[in-house]
């Protein structure tokens, strides 16, 4: 009877467990971040999830489809976490500092620039647009916080979109690695403090 209720070809679901598609995406995110786009196969994802390769292909016809959804879901979660941090009653500077630390803890061991460059050559224009839209959501969360801070006279009047792009540009330095794969600063706390101080002193006009 249960077999008849689900669409033909759809993998069986255990109602008490996390949805299979969610499990696939979560494992794919980790594998892609750890190993890069090219080195991860659909078989790797299936084995990591404890499902068949056919199950992965049921939800995602191609690796590019899986990668796109994995990255979109990851950015949506980041946006939600950013919004949660920025919604606290603390100052913008304190909230941004906390957000930078959360970001760096999640990505400190990853060369994000090389990671995204490697993957983008394999994606269609539509898939790239999906990722760009998700990325824009992250920017919007920060931009809204910047706008509120300007209205509350917490930071000087200026273009909140410019402030936002400046913030993300400086934030990306946290993922910089030299030829020996070493970061500029040895600890996440020190990196976060340097990023925030540089950004804050810049928009506040301090020299």
Could you tell me what each predicted segment is?
Residues 102-144, 151:
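Short secondary-structure transition hinges
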Residues 72-78:
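Short, basic, alpha-helical segments at the C-terminal edge of helix-turn-helix-like DNA-binding modules
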Residues 69, 83-109, 163-167:
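Hydrophobic alpha-helical connector segments
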Residues 1-35, 40-51, 65-68:
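Basic, helix-initiating cap at the start of DNA-binding domains
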Residues 49-60:
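Short hydrophobic/aromatic patch on the recognition helix
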Residues 93-94, 129-135, 148-168, 186-190:
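All-alpha amphipathic helical-bundle segments outside canonical DNA-binding/catalytic cores
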Residues 1-8, 140, 144-152, 169-177, ...:
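C-terminal peripheral helix-coil segments that are non-catalytic and often amphipathic
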Residues 34-37, 58, 152:
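Helix-turn-helix/winged-helix DNA-binding modules
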């Amino acid at each position: 009877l249960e077999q008849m209720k689900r669409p033909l070809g759809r993998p069986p679901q255990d109602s008490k467990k996390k949805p299979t598609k969610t499990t696939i995406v979560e494992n794919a995110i980790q594998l892609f971040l750890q190993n890069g786009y090219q080195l991860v196969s659909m078989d790797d994802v299936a084995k990591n999830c404890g499902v068949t390769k056919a199950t992965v292909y049921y939800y995602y016809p191609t690796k590019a489809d899986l990668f796109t959804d994995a990255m979109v879901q990851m950015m949506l979660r980041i946006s939600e976490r950013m919004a949660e941090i920025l919604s606290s009653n603390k100052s913008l500077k304190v909230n941004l500092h906390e957000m930078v630390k959360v970001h760096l803890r999640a990505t400190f061991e990853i060369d994000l620039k090389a990671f995204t460059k490697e993957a983008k050559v394999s994606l269609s224009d539509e898939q790239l647009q999906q990722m760009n839209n998700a990325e824009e959501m992250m920017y919007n969360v920060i931009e809204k916080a910047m706008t509120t801070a300007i209205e509350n006279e917490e930071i000087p009047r200026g273009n909140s979109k410019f402030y936002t792009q400046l913030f993300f540009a400086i934030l990306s330095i946290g993922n910089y690695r030299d030829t020996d794969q070493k970061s500029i600063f040895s600890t996440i706390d020190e990196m976060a403090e340097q990023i925030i101080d540089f950004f804050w002193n810049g928009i506040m006009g301090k020299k």
